[in-house]
Amino acid sequence: MTKSFSIYLDLIRFSAAFVVLLWHSRPLYEHNLTISQYGHEAVIIFFVLSGFVIAYVTDTKEKGLKDYAISRAARIYSVAIPAIIITALVDFSGYTLNSSAYPEAYRAWDLAGIRVISSLLFTNELWTLSTQLFSNVPYWSLNYEVWYYVAFAILTFVNGFKRWLIFGVVCLFVGPKIFLLMPVWWL
């Protein structure tokens, strides 16, 4: 991949992420930009490009499961840990200053430990679960992405019948919500 093509892909990913940000901030503004209605499509674009980039990096730079796992963990936790900390701090402060600004769903501080642990383990969205990270609605996408990393690793680094057995077990573990969107990541 050339440097200019890599920059081009980064620009598309950044643009898609920005559209998602606009979509999530729509409730804050009376007049929405037309482009903000394409948040769902932007998520799909982001997932497709992520799958492409991960496949490329795995093919050219990461020489085994260990390299792949270390790279993916570093990438995902460099986003997840700050997101968890910042969300908890902002929500706690915001709720303390003006609790009426927070819908009932975001006030579940009695489940704070469960929300944080499931967010660190990326188990928020398994099967019918939707354990939201306080007010951080977009955090679901990290959960999906992690399980796509796992599935990709299995299909890339495990051979023979064991590959399909482990892949099947992971699909059964994560459930249909995550599994049904998985092909988008591999387009």
Describe every region a protein language model picked out.
Residues 40-62, 141-160, 164-187:
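Specific transmembrane alpha-helix
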Residues 12-22, 42, 48, 82-90, ...:
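Lipid-exposed faces of alpha-helical membrane segments in multi-pass integral membrane proteins
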Residues 28-32, 60, 92-103, 160-161:
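Transmembrane helix-loop junctions in multipass membrane proteins, especially transporters and channels
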Residues 10, 68, 141-143:
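Short alpha-helical catalytic segment bearing the HExxH-like zincin motif
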Residues 4-59, 74-83, 179-180, 184:
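Functionally critical transmembrane alpha-helices in membrane proteins and complexes, commonly lining
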Residues 67-71, 75:
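Short amphipathic alpha-helical coupling elements at transmembrane boundaries
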Residues 55, 77-146, 150:
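Membrane-interface helix-loop-helix regions
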Residues 1-6, 67:
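Short, Lys/Arg-rich N-terminal segment immediately upstream of the first membrane anchor
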